From Swiss-Prot:
DNA-binding region: 124-218
Protein name (record): Forkhead box protein J1-B
Pfam families for the chain: Forkhead
Cellular localization per UniProt: Nucleus
Family: Belongs to the FOXJ1 family.
Major localization listed first in the record, in broad terms: nucleus
Name of the gene: foxj1-b
Length: 439
């Protein structure tokens, strides 16, 4: 029977003790690193990492690993330790760096000037479309360039656009149309070819080359010089017209206010001096100086002692049949006819034809001489001032005593003009029966 050696359990026990001690040490270091930063993106392990401590090619010793156990210290601490590209790079403890900084430093290893865009079809030029257009225009050394020439220059100098999708040409056209830095020049009639030309605005050339104008912007509203001058003239004319209108309105308002004050004073004076005129014709004072516009109506006031207060109220509108004899007989006492000598008979505003038949109770009355117009021009001028009053006066003269007519006597009848009170009324009461011949 084969006897097992007694040293084997001792070697296994020593190996297990060594493995357990190393495992506890690794757990302590891991817990300490976790306590520093719990983030998943923590790079704290880079501070303790050194490629000199990583024994990639170290094999386990025969004494310590006779049963196939491996020491944890021989494993690499990071994936970079097993990367052959990292073997020649020095790894020393330092501050952690971010991934973006690593990429920036990696890209910095390849300078932009070393890339040949003319032959490299995989790298897109780091220029905006507006900058490419500006570069093509400046390279042509011409004041204007066609769209096809811009395409040709870009494809000749940048290999990327020769192999890329041709949709970039749409972007070139959009930039030419929408960017205010480029101006379209129409083709002359005698120039061969088709299509227009494009040129760059000189004030934006430097900014384009510096990369400041990389966004599309709407072109500004450009007004033709002819339209601009017409607009300026129209605005100046409008300002003058508005100023003139304001001055005219202010002057008209001032004159109208003064005229209303004068007219109102004359109206009150006329009402106070001639109470009979206020009863017979409430608008007689307006016929002497008519307003250009009917702004207000004078109140019909009466200070005549012939009528009482109740009769004055009822006399506002004389409707129905009435008798002049009853009116004169009821109010004949206490009348001072000396006031009629100062009255003036106002001729009507409209010309009165001689064929007008003025008949009262079958007796014909001739028209006064003052009623006939002095001239056609004067009649036309007076007619245009107050048409409604002229119409009332004319209609009354044509139909003096129409039966069953419900009109306001104070608006249509003028007793002074009808009876010629200046000559007909006697100065004394003894001659009053002579008035009966008119009735």
């Amino acid at each position: 029977m084969f006897d097992l050696p007694t040293v084997a359990p001792l070697d296994m026990e020593d190996s297990w003790v060594t493995f357990q001690a190393e495992g506890d040490q690794g757990q302590d270091s891991f817990s300490s690193s976790v306590n520093l930063d719990d983030s998943l993106t923590s790079l704290q392990w880079l501070q303790e990492f050194s490629i000199l401590n990583a024994n990639v090619g170290k094999t386990p010793s025969s004494s310590g690993d006779s049963h196939g156990y491996r020491h944890l210290s021989g494993a690499p601490c990071s994936p970079l330790a097993a990367d052959p590209a990292c073997l020649g790079m020095p790894h020393t403890p330092g501050k952690p760096i971010s991934s973006s900084t690593s990429r920036a430093s990696h890209l910095g290893l390849q300078p932009m000037e070393e890339i040949d865009y003319k032959t490299n079809p995989h790298v897109k030029p780091p220029y905006s479309y507006a900058t490419l257009i500006c570069m093509a225009m400046q390279a042509s050394k011409k004041t204007k360039i066609t769209l096809s020439a811009i395409y040709k220059w870009i494809t000749d100098n940048f290999c990327y656009f020769r192999h890329a999708d041709p949709t970039w040409q749409n972007s070139i056209r959009h930039n030419l149309s929408l960017n205010k830095c480029f101006i379209k020049v129409p083709r002359e009639k005698d120039e061969p070819g088709k299509g227009g030309f494009w040129k760059i605005d000189p004030q934006y050339a430097d900014r384009l080359m510096n990369g400041a104008m990389k966004k599309r912007r709407l072109p500004p509203v450009q007004i033709h010089p002819a339209f601009a001058s017409a607009q300026a003239a129209a605005s100046s004319n409008g300002n003058r017209a508005s100023a003139w209108q304001m001055s005219v309105n202010s002057e008209s308002h001032k004159l109208l206010k003064e005229f209303e004050e004068i007219t109102s004073e004359q109206s009150w004076n006329a009402l106070g001096e001639h109470g009979w005129n206020a009863i017979s014709d409430g608008k007689s004072h307006k016929r002497k100086q008519p307003l250009p516009k009917r702004m207000f109506k004078a109140p019909r006031l009466s200070s005549s002692p012939m009528l009482s207060q109740e009769e004055q109220t009822e006399l506002g509108s004389l409707k129905g049949d009435f008798d002049w004899e009853v009116i004169f007989d009821s109010s004949i006492n206490g009348v001072n006819f000396s006031a009629f000598e100062d009255l003036e008979v106002t001729p009507p505003l409209s010309p009165v034809s001689r064929s007008v038949d003025l008949t009262v109770h079958g007796k014909h009355i001739d028209c006064p001489q003052q009623w006939y117009p002095m001239g056609q021009d004067q009649a036309v001028a007076q007619n245009s001032l107050d048409f409604d009053e002229t119409f009332l006066a004319t209609s009354f003269l044509q139909h003096p005593w129409e039966e069953n007519r419900n009109d306001y006597l104070s608006n249509s009848a003028n007793i002074e003009q009808l009876f010629d009170l200046n000559d007909a009324f006697p100065a004394e009461l003894n001659d009053w029966p002579a008035l009966g011949s008119y009735i």
